[in-house]
Amino acid sequence: NQNETQVTVTDNEEVKNEEVKQDDTASTGTPDLSKMSEADKRAFFAEELKNSAIENQFGKTETIVVNEGTKYQYHMILAFPGTAIASQIEDDATTDATGNVDFTKLMQGAVDNGVISFPQVKSLDFWNYHKGYSEVAAKVLNFLNDGLAGNLE
Protein backbone atom coordinates (compact mmCIF):
# COMPACT_ATOMS: atom_id res chain seq x y z
CA ASN A 1 0.00 0.00 0.00
CA GLN A 2 2.82 2.36 0.79
CA ASN A 3 4.33 1.78 -2.66
CA GLU A 4 0.91 2.26 -4.21
CA THR A 5 0.57 5.64 -2.49
CA GLN A 6 3.99 6.71 -3.70
CA VAL A 7 3.11 5.71 -7.24
CA THR A 8 -0.14 7.65 -7.01
CA VAL A 9 1.69 10.72 -5.73
CA THR A 10 4.24 10.40 -8.51
CA ASP A 11 1.49 9.99 -11.08
CA ASN A 12 -0.31 13.04 -9.68
CA GLU A 13 2.91 15.06 -9.86
CA GLU A 14 3.39 14.02 -13.48
CA VAL A 15 -0.19 14.98 -14.28
CA LYS A 16 0.26 18.30 -12.48
CA ASN A 17 3.48 19.00 -14.41
CA GLU A 18 1.74 18.16 -17.67
CA GLU A 19 -1.15 20.50 -16.78
CA VAL A 20 1.31 23.31 -16.06
CA LYS A 21 2.87 22.86 -19.48
CA GLN A 22 -0.54 22.94 -21.17
CA ASP A 23 -2.01 25.79 -19.12
CA ASP A 24 -0.20 29.05 -19.82
CA THR A 25 -1.94 30.72 -16.89
CA ALA A 26 -0.01 28.62 -14.38
CA SER A 27 3.20 30.60 -14.71
CA THR A 28 2.01 34.04 -15.81
CA GLY A 29 -1.50 34.27 -14.41
CA THR A 30 -2.64 35.56 -17.81
CA PRO A 31 -4.87 33.39 -19.96
CA ASP A 32 -4.46 33.23 -23.72
CA LEU A 33 -6.18 36.51 -24.59
CA SER A 34 -6.48 35.57 -28.26
CA LYS A 35 -9.02 32.91 -27.28
CA MET A 36 -11.20 35.27 -25.22
CA SER A 37 -14.20 37.33 -26.30
CA GLU A 38 -13.96 41.10 -25.86
CA ALA A 39 -16.40 40.93 -22.94
CA ASP A 40 -14.33 38.23 -21.23
CA LYS A 41 -11.15 40.26 -21.78
CA ARG A 42 -12.72 43.32 -20.18
CA ALA A 43 -13.98 41.28 -17.24
CA PHE A 44 -10.52 39.74 -16.80
CA PHE A 45 -8.83 43.15 -17.06
CA ALA A 46 -11.27 44.68 -14.53
CA GLU A 47 -10.53 41.91 -12.03
CA GLU A 48 -6.80 42.25 -12.69
CA LEU A 49 -6.97 46.02 -12.03
CA LYS A 50 -8.90 45.47 -8.81
CA ASN A 51 -6.34 42.94 -7.58
CA SER A 52 -3.34 45.08 -8.54
CA ALA A 53 -4.39 48.17 -6.55
CA ILE A 54 -1.92 49.48 -3.98
CA GLU A 55 -2.39 51.65 -0.93
CA ASN A 56 -2.82 55.33 -1.79
CA GLN A 57 0.63 56.94 -1.95
CA PHE A 58 -0.65 60.51 -1.40
CA GLY A 59 0.44 61.84 1.98
CA LYS A 60 2.78 58.93 2.74
CA THR A 61 5.75 60.15 4.74
CA GLU A 62 9.37 59.25 5.20
CA THR A 63 11.76 60.57 7.81
CA ILE A 64 15.25 61.32 6.58
CA VAL A 65 18.40 62.03 8.56
CA VAL A 66 20.73 64.67 7.19
CA ASN A 67 24.43 64.84 8.10
CA GLU A 68 23.96 61.68 10.14
CA GLY A 69 26.50 61.13 12.87
CA THR A 70 27.82 64.68 12.86
CA LYS A 71 27.12 67.65 15.11
CA TYR A 72 25.13 69.07 12.16
CA GLN A 73 22.66 66.17 12.09
CA TYR A 74 18.96 66.98 11.74
CA HIS A 75 15.79 65.14 10.71
CA MET A 76 13.25 66.06 8.06
CA ILE A 77 9.89 64.54 7.22
CA LEU A 78 9.04 64.21 3.54
CA ALA A 79 5.41 63.88 2.43
CA PHE A 80 4.38 62.52 -0.98
CA PRO A 81 2.33 65.19 -2.79
CA GLY A 82 0.52 62.79 -5.10
CA THR A 83 1.39 61.44 -8.51
CA ALA A 84 0.45 64.51 -10.58
CA ILE A 85 2.40 67.00 -8.47
CA ALA A 86 5.41 64.70 -7.97
CA SER A 87 5.57 64.06 -11.69
CA GLN A 88 5.33 67.79 -12.44
CA ILE A 89 8.11 68.57 -9.94
CA GLU A 90 10.36 66.04 -11.67
CA ASP A 91 9.36 67.16 -15.17
CA ASP A 92 10.07 70.80 -14.32
CA ALA A 93 13.47 69.84 -12.91
CA THR A 94 14.52 67.65 -15.83
CA THR A 95 16.72 69.77 -18.05
CA ASP A 96 17.03 67.72 -21.23
CA ALA A 97 16.38 64.42 -22.97
CA THR A 98 19.27 62.78 -21.11
CA GLY A 99 17.37 63.15 -17.85
CA ASN A 100 19.78 65.52 -16.11
CA VAL A 101 18.18 67.07 -13.05
CA ASP A 102 18.30 70.75 -12.16
CA PHE A 103 18.44 70.41 -8.37
CA THR A 104 17.47 74.04 -7.80
CA LYS A 105 14.20 73.49 -9.68
CA LEU A 106 13.67 70.13 -7.97
CA MET A 107 14.13 71.57 -4.50
CA GLN A 108 12.10 74.70 -5.26
CA GLY A 109 9.27 72.45 -6.44
CA ALA A 110 9.59 70.35 -3.30
CA VAL A 111 9.50 73.44 -1.07
CA ASP A 112 6.60 75.04 -2.97
CA ASN A 113 4.52 71.85 -2.84
CA GLY A 114 5.12 70.86 0.78
CA VAL A 115 7.22 67.78 0.06
CA ILE A 116 9.38 68.81 3.02
CA SER A 117 6.62 68.77 5.62
CA PHE A 118 8.89 69.19 8.65
CA PRO A 119 10.49 71.50 9.35
CA GLN A 120 8.39 73.94 7.36
CA VAL A 121 10.98 75.11 4.87
CA LYS A 122 9.79 78.28 3.13
CA SER A 123 12.84 78.89 0.95
CA LEU A 124 16.02 77.30 -0.30
CA ASP A 125 17.74 79.88 1.91
CA PHE A 126 17.11 77.42 4.76
CA TRP A 127 20.35 75.80 3.63
CA ASN A 128 22.28 79.04 4.14
CA TYR A 129 22.07 78.06 7.82
CA HIS A 130 22.08 74.25 7.61
CA LYS A 131 24.44 71.79 5.99
CA GLY A 132 23.26 69.06 3.68
CA TYR A 133 21.46 70.73 0.76
CA SER A 134 22.77 68.29 -1.86
CA GLU A 135 22.11 65.33 0.44
CA VAL A 136 18.51 66.44 0.94
CA ALA A 137 18.07 67.05 -2.79
CA ALA A 138 19.17 63.49 -3.59
CA LYS A 139 16.88 62.06 -0.90
CA VAL A 140 13.93 64.15 -2.14
CA LEU A 141 14.47 62.86 -5.69
CA ASN A 142 14.64 59.24 -4.47
CA PHE A 143 11.53 59.76 -2.33
CA LEU A 144 9.53 61.20 -5.24
CA ASN A 145 10.67 58.34 -7.49
CA ASP A 146 9.62 55.79 -4.87
CA GLY A 147 6.20 57.40 -4.62
CA LEU A 148 5.77 57.53 -8.38
CA ALA A 149 6.67 53.84 -8.54
CA GLY A 150 4.13 53.05 -5.81
CA ASN A 151 6.78 51.84 -3.39
CA LEU A 152 6.09 54.01 -0.33
CA GLU A 153 4.79 52.22 2.74
Locate the predicted segments by residue:
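Short acidic, Pro/Gly- and aromatic-enriched capping/linker segments at domain boundaries
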Residues: 49-67
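Charge-rich, low-complexity terminal tails
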Residues: 1-5, 42-47
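N-terminal acidic, proline/glycine-rich, low-complexity intrinsically disordered segments
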Residues: 1-16
